[in-house]
């Protein structure tokens, strides 16, 4: 199992390998536009704290203003994966919650709030519309609000795509744990 932990209060995303060692650390924003219905975690709002599964990734060549170098799909932690993690000793049931790597949270929450998936992405199309305009494809672009997923700097996302590519190919389980509520950013 690879464990990706998004600590929204700190604005940070950490990637831990199967042995628990830190592989990658990056700035991240979990702030959403907040314009959607079904608050506080429905479409247009931030993802609920808890455990999720990374489902796959798409690499863009060339990068796009919306996603930067690519996007990583995030879905609810399904019952089969949850059972596999418990049976392997990688997770424990704690009442209604699940403990993974000493972090306790609910398993998923997307479906509960009318979502099927969200993404981890780079880019930020609003940057090109600012005065003066900023480059959404810059390696360390300003992190802007999204539709509720997580946004990384393009350089960090490019590295994360490289790190996770073999794991997706080998069908390694990749868990995303989202901690806390999002920080507030100044861009819509």
Q: Which role does the model predict for each range below?
A:
Residues 20-26:
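Surface-exposed loop/edge segments in extracytoplasmic proteins
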Residues 1-7, 60-63, 164-165:
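Short linear motifs in intrinsically disordered
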Residues 1, 8-10, 49, 67-69, ...:
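Extracytoplasmic
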Residues 11-15:
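Short beta-strand scaffold segments in enzyme catalytic cores
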Residues 16-20, 75-78:
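Secondary-structure transition/turn motif
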Residues 1-3, 26-51, 55-56:
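N-terminal post-signal-peptidase region of extra-cytosolic proteins
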Residues 62-188:
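Exported/periplasmic cell-wall-interacting domains
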